[in-house]
Amino acid sequence: MKTDIDIAQSITLKPITEIVEKVGISFDDIELYGKYKAKLSFDKINAVKDNAPGKLILVTAINPTPAGEGKSTITIGLADALSKIGKKTMIALREPSLGPVMGIKGGAAGGGYAQVLPMEDINLHFTGDMHAITTANNALSALIDNHIHQGNVIGIDQRRIIWKRVVDLNDRALRKVTVGLGGPLNGIPREDGFDITVASEIMAILCLATDINDLKERLANIVIGYRFDCSPVYVRDLAVEGALTLILKDAIKPNLVQTIYGTPAFVHGGPFANIAHGCNSVLATTTALRLADYTVTEAGFGADLGAEKFLDIKVPNLPKAPDAVVIVATLRALKMHGGVAKTELSAENVEAVKAGFSNLKRHVENIRKYGIPAVVAINEFVSDTAAEIAVLKELCAAIGVPVELASVWANGADGGVELAETVVATIDNQAASYQRLYKSEDSLEEKVTKIVTQIYGGTGVVFEKKARNQLTEFAKNGWDKLPVCMAKTQYSFSDDQFALGAPTDFDITVREFVPKLGAGFIVALTGDVMTMPGLPKAPVALNMDVAADGTAIGLF
């Protein structure tokens, strides 16, 4: 069987100039990064800003398991299938982070015959956006430490700096470090730490900014720490937002690539959904809506994280809410949610499918709370049996949700035609009536509680002492009217990663809040979620190499 990289390297790509013509983008509208990658100019973005938006399809999933759900694969395959049935379609995806690519994922550009290309470039350095975000983040760290070293005119309390350095790798050794050692010429010693780049607030800002001016304003609003009198210190107090914007002036432009079947795709921005808001850039999604009749996008991890954040944080910054939400599930994952061990997933187990359906059902119910119709996509595996498929279809029918098999990994666009037709029919026959889960005027405590009780299915929220004190502090600062971005394990509705299925009678513990005023939300840290991942015992980097002719080996 061919691997993803084997398939990708067997495809003859078309010049990106030819691909983007399908959606009305000319040679003069793009900035080329070789023959197959480009960035879209702001002139073109501004030229289409008054176009009526097309239909928006959000792809999400059940809570992920080690068995894998294939959300990006379905996103790409669905878009190719929409193109195949005659719909003018674009994709809007996130950029992969090099840390997970070298750790456990091996790549994040789809799979099989549903990939965005050139996958090697996309999975590695691409157009340099990650480097620019990393540099801007660390430039701010350097400027903070320099300000303190040079006299600390604005009175930053070096014990209360919350801004961390970043690197686009999984490196647990950098979670906590000490900087400024080596004597007075090397700065003021203080505790610091590293996050992974995709957890940086600058990544979130880049993905929520609507133009250069908005980017600069958001950067100016970043809270980097506190003074000795406990008042917040903003980037604007250091007067460096202009320099940071300069570093990011090209990174903010959306990247254009293609699928195996030639569907134009924006791949831009990449915040994680468990520790950030998990969506590609507003600029990419908005521009795709202005250029195409159908835009297919995705949100990270399960619908309890990525979709909730898409609908509560990203949608208010878009021209419209989704017309439909596709929830990806696999029979293998449903069986795991039903109590089957990973080693036994290939064996038929209808009862486990029935038990695991509770997870999918809760996600469907949650999407409906937003007033948006849902469609279930079963990402097909060779181990799926007719009996398992039949019972899943019966269970979906019982709750009135359309369901289709999708074999886009093996069959590309052909394997997604029925799904595409069902999604189009759903959009045509069921008008979405989007409503946000909470109101802006709700307190932080109320917002978190609504997410926990209405989306996660929990009983309530336990705020640890630090978080409880921050509720008062943030309300005093006027920050409590911002949206909440929950940092939680992706594997469960609860904050216990081992509580699979649809757990009930649990509380979520919030240990701390982190203000992300530039991004425009407050992060609530739960459980033991970390903003700098570590590598597994056997990282997939051990299998990566490059041939003498420069061909990449080991990505998947």
From Swiss-Prot:
<dbReference type="InterPro" id="IPR027417">
    <property type="entry name" value="P-loop_NTPase"/>
</dbReference>
<dbReference type="GO" id="GO:0035999">
    <property type="term" value="P:tetrahydrofolate interconversion"/>
</dbReference>
<dbReference type="InterPro" id="IPR000559">
    <property type="entry name" value="Formate_THF_ligase"/>
</dbReference>
<keyword id="KW-0436">Ligase</keyword>
<dbReference type="GO" id="GO:0005524">
    <property type="term" value="F:ATP binding"/>
</dbReference>
<protein>
    <recommendedName>
        <fullName>Formate--tetrahydrofolate ligase</fullName>
        <ecNumber>6.3.4.3</ecNumber>
    </recommendedName>
</protein>
<keyword id="KW-0547">Nucleotide-binding</keyword>
<comment type="similarity">
    <text>Belongs to the formate--tetrahydrofolate ligase family.</text>
</comment>
<dbReference type="Pfam" id="PF01268">
    <property type="entry name" value="FTHFS"/>
</dbReference>
<keyword id="KW-0067">ATP-binding</keyword>
<keyword id="KW-0554">One-carbon metabolism</keyword>
<dbReference type="GO" id="GO:0004329">
    <property type="term" value="F:formate-tetrahydrofolate ligase activity"/>
</dbReference>
<comment type="pathway">
    <text>One-carbon metabolism; tetrahydrofolate interconversion.</text>
</comment>
<feature type="binding site">
    <location>
        <begin position="65"/>
        <end position="72"/>
    </location>
    <ligand>
        <name>ATP</name>
    </ligand>
</feature>
<dbReference type="InterPro" id="IPR020628">
    <property type="entry name" value="Formate_THF_ligase_CS"/>
</dbReference>
